[in-house]
Amino acid sequence: MVKVAINGFGRIGRLVLRIALQRKALEVVAVNDPFISVDYAAYMFKYDSTHGRYKGEVTTSGNDLVIDGHKIAVFQEKDPANLPWGKLGVDIVIDSTGVFKELDSAQKHLDAGAKKVVITAPSKTAPMFVVGVNEDKYNGETIVSNASCTTNCLAPIAKIINDEFGIDEALMTTVHSITATQKTVDGPSHKDWRGGRTASGNIIPSSTGAAKAVGKVLPELQGKLTGMAFRVPTVDVSVVDLTVKLAKEATYDEIKAAVKKASQGKLKNVVGYTEDSVVSSDFLGDTHSTIFDASAGIQLSPKFVKVVAWYDNEYGYSERVVDLVEHVA
């Protein structure tokens, strides 16, 4: 059994716990969040406005969260270096705080006795891995990043298209559901003025490093891809719109066939494929990183095409976090 601790019990941390509990090879032994007491952790885990109630039994015992009889120690420590990871025999820490996402800060978990760290955010300094794209390049690094939910949606599709037809250049737009950092009403947001506007009543243009990050996990696309985001008032599920200038001429049917083939092969759990007339809520709880929407894409000419792919930016991403944990273990 691989012993796992979760640092940061927000949207991703809680879903990662739900998923990890279903994996036979993993044992979650601890959760740390300085802002959440043990009884509140139980409540937040049990009830979820987006993904519904947890189906099993959730209680507490002293400082432990007890899920279906399985005890998980809960800590409220601000500095990861002070956590008892060594004493608990923690193999891998999943850091979903969004705070400790660089090598120097994530190192604190190793100093506390953990063997490895998986960061659930893009990182400037830690190597980034996207399951289905470059996880085979993993070479024993102790601190790794699972990149972002949008990179996990975009990279597999970009890889399939690039492998088959070549990408000369591409622009991505993600139409992205709201996240915890946005505001319920207009409020201060000094780094991103637009991001401080009411989330539920606006379409908000935003920056994203997701497209450029594809160049880190697929070096052959370095400098060929960039993108931006629109934050829209939906609670979960987002969609990538990728406009591509192809190196080789292709019909849209050939592109569809290439993605469909990949979705039935070794990328089966990562890439989904649909020709149905779907909308965003149809993908709530979908475990794929990306679902290619064959009937939404369009083609202008043999080398100029727009493809569309959906993703549950919470649940699908959390599934890949746990996949990466199993892989680095």
From Swiss-Prot:
The active site is at 149 (nucleophile). Its EC number is 1.2.1.12. The keyword Cytoplasm applies. Pfam families: Gp_dh_C, Gp_dh_N. Pathway: Carbohydrate degradation; glycolysis; pyruvate from D-glyceraldehyde 3-phosphate: step 1/5. It is found in: Cytoplasm. One of its GO terms (biological process) is glycolytic process. One of its GO terms (cellular component) is cytosol. Belongs to the glyceraldehyde-3-phosphate dehydrogenase family. NCBIfam families: GAPDH-I (TIGR01534). This is Glyceraldehyde-3-phosphate dehydrogenase 1.
